[in-house]
């Protein structure tokens, strides 16, 4: 079963919000990370449309996908987003396949974390954020999450993230999954798990490799 989400309309909500659109078009391209402007607009648009009380992101990194959520929360005038990232090279490298693991092992995680916190302060959105500097497997996810963005490890840990978030979403809550075609198929197994537990796939961006699931 597939229920369509009109992503173009959702992105337009973000474009129509002058402050949010300006931040995404000017700030996002300057940040470390891989979130596209299209995905950033979608995340912000979902927040603007759904008016969530609670959002959660696994794999906050430099904030390239987290900040659009915060900008939209600020525009809404309330809500909170939890960002989870250990900022630890050992943890990051352990969650990847050879080749990728070497890259993560040499990355200056401290510098990325420093940049992220500087962005929170510079954009005046820290009050909407709760940052948890831990492995996602060590975090007890709260209940009644409205919007979740899962973009941490994409191997077995990524599947476990999806598995653990499944019962924590509110009814009609939305899960955005990144790198769905990652080597090893862990995220695809996560999609199957969500489908088996009452979620529907509402949108899939094949070119950019992410999708949107919604709890029925």
Q: Can you say where each PLM-predicted feature lies in the sequence?
A:
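N-terminal auxiliary segments of SAM/dcSAM-dependent transferases
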Residues: 1-10
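Class I SAM-dependent methyltransferase Rossmann-like catalytic core
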Residues: 14-50
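S-adenosylmethionine/decaboxylated-SAM
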Residues: 29, 41-216
